[in-house]
Amino acid sequence: MTLSKNENIKAKQKQINLPKILRQEIKENNKIIKWFYNIVMLLGGIGFLIVGISSYIGNNLIYFLDASEIIFFPQGITMCFYGTCGILFSINQISIILNGVGEGYNEFNKELNLMTIYRKGKQGKNSDINITYSLKDIEGIRIEIKNEYFNVKQNVFLRIKDKNDLPIIQLSNPIKISDLEKQASEIASFLNVPIKGY
């Protein structure tokens, strides 16, 4: 069976109109919840530290945080320690959220025959992750679902020729399996490669 001239033209136009670039933005989930927990932790840490210092100087730095019945050693010094840890940890986590650490994109560019995986790192030199491969090296897509007690991990990997599988989607908060399959099939369809099991 041969195509008519008009059908050939339409087929070529369809190929020309096909997207040449697939880009998936990777964003942090549950930012509002993380903001809430870290602000609560920060305020709690400040409260502990103030009570610990108040027990040391024998005077309440803030009137509603009563430290009159707390002995500096061992209770006060312990509260100072936990308060300092809470403050430092929450500030670090807030900094990670503000700077978008772990966010980035997956880009598949047929024009350049190039795949780019970019993730933002912490502030500092060479902390960002920027991985590139030729599209020809991609052999397939692999979906992985792990049930570890109460923790469900959902991952999508690229199977790279002569290399370890490369994670491109990593979800600590589970989504519907159909949604995960949809994301994986979008990449597989664009690259024309197979999807392999769970």
UniProtKB/Swiss-Prot annotation:
Residue ranges of the TM segments: 35-57, 70-92
Organism superkingdom: Eukaryota
Compartments, as annotated in UniProt: Plastid, Chloroplast thylakoid membrane
UniProt keyword terms in alphabetical order: Chloroplast, Membrane, Photosynthesis, Plastid, Thylakoid, Transmembrane, Transmembrane helix
Record-linked InterPro entries: PSI_Ycf4_assembly
GO CC field: chloroplast thylakoid membrane; photosystem I
Membrane topology: Multi-pass membrane protein
S-S bridge residues: none
Gene Ontology process terms (BP): photosynthesis
Entry-linked HAMAP family: Ycf4 (MF_00437)
Function, in words: Seems to be required for the assembly of the photosystem I complex.
Family: Belongs to the Ycf4 family.
Descriptive protein name: Photosystem I assembly protein Ycf4
Species, as recorded: Euglena gracilis
GN (gene name): ycf4
